[in-house]
């Protein structure tokens, strides 16, 4: 489609919405035009630059949508036996940007199932997911006061409605090399593993700087487009994401909802799987984490932080029998039909 944009005389006082309607512009092009037009009316160069950056972002998203619509299906991998369960709370611009990049990456590379549980004070912030055509998305929006972040509950509510044999507890800020997704699903389906960490234990994490060129990445979703100097090497062991046999994940209690907010639930989860004698394995490859600003939802500044640590210490001291008894009788399971 070769559409040439005319130049507008701002003195003619044309209403922006009128322009968008007359040109029959879609969501992304409409917003790009809006920001371009209003940028010329700003009093300072900084204000003008912000609008031009916004226009650039919407144009990049439009390019991505067109890429997705014309993508080579031979390059889209089949993960239809897997469901990604992704808890989301868009409490910052960084988190929104990461959601665009991560979900766009999954959409570019896989045909798969995704359940998103979004906590929000009002309307959904994920205004782009309808363009992700390769993902079969179930988007749950929960209006919440956001006094605290109960991520473990979000995950269990999604886990309870998963219909595929493989499920992935997935962080909205991470991506993996494409082969790691394929190998992890294979290990679960073949019965070799009950749970798979799709990254190595050690210096396998690459933290992506806030200052990397996101517009370039969001066009082709190519990990090679991220400059090495903007990748920081960190250790990885827990968190990020984990592939699981759906039935066994449910059988051993899913997520422990007594952990509220930021805490050691990632460590507890691995310790539980090992104590209860499940087969846990790893794919020794990298995990890429998009950095984001830290809020009360992603640091230890919470009234629940100390109780979370005490619960972790209690559970870590349990043997097979005491842990089995605990998770067989834990109260939160009563809410979910598949957990009983």
Question: What do the PLM-derived regions correspond to, one by one?
Answer:
Residues 103-143:
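Acidic donor-binding segment of Leloir-type glycosyltransferases
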Residues 145-161:
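Glycine-rich, basic loop-to-helix element that forms the pyrophosphate-binding segment
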Residues 79, 94-98, 236, 258-340:
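C-terminal catalytic/acceptor-binding lobe
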Residues 162-165, 254:
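Active-site acidic short loop of glycosyltransferases
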Residues 177-257:
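Conserved catalytic core of nucleotide-sugar-dependent glycosyltransferases
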Residues 72-105:
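N-proximal low-complexity "stem/linker" segments adjacent to membrane-targeting elements
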Residues 165-177:
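Short beta-strand-to-loop acidic/aromatic patch adjacent to the donor-nucleotide binding site
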Residues 1-73:
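Intrinsically disordered, low-complexity regulatory regions
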């Amino acid at each position: 489609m070769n559409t040439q944009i005319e130049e507008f005389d701002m003195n003619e006082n044309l209403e922006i919405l009128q322009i968008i309607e007359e040109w029959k512009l879609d969501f992304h092009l409409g917003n790009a035009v809006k920001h371009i037009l209003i940028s010329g009316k700003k009093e300072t160069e900084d204000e003008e630059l912000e609008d031009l950056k916004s226009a650039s972002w919407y144009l990049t998203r439009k390019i991505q949508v067109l890429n997705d619509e014309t993508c080579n299906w031979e390059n889209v991998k089949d993960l239809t036996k897997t469901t990604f369960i992704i808890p989301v709370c868009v409490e910052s611009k960084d988190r929104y940007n990461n959601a665009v990049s991560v979900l766009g990456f999954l959409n570019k590379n896989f045909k798969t199932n995704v359940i998103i549980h979004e906590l929000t004070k009002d309307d959904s912030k994920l205004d782009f997911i309808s363009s992700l055509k390769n993902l079969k998305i179930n988007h749950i929006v929960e209006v919440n006061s956001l006094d605290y972040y109960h991520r473990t509950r979000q995950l269990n509510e999604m886990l309870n409605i998963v219909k595929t044999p493989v499920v992935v507890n997935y962080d909205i800020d991470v991506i993996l090399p494409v082969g790691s997704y394929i190998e992890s699903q294979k290990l679960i389906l073949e019965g070799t593993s009950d749970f798979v960490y799709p990254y190595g234990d050690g210096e396998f994490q690459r933290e992506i700087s806030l200052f990397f060129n996101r517009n370039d990445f969001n066009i082709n979703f190519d990990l090679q487009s991220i400059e090495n100097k903007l990748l920081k090497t960190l250790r990885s062991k827990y968190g990020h994401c984990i592939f699981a046999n759906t039935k066994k994940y449910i059988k051993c209690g899913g997520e422990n909802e007594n952990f509220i907010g930021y805490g050691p639930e990632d460590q507890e989860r691995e310790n539980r799987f090992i104590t209860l004698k499940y087969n846990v394995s790893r794919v020794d490859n990298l995990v890429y984490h998009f950095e984001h600003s830290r809020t009360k939802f992603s640091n230890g500044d919470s009234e629940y932080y100390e109780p979370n640590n005490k619960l972790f210490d209690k559970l870590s001291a349990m043997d097979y029998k005491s842990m089995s008894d605990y998770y067989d009788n834990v109260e939160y399971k009563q809410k979910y039909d598949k957990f009983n």
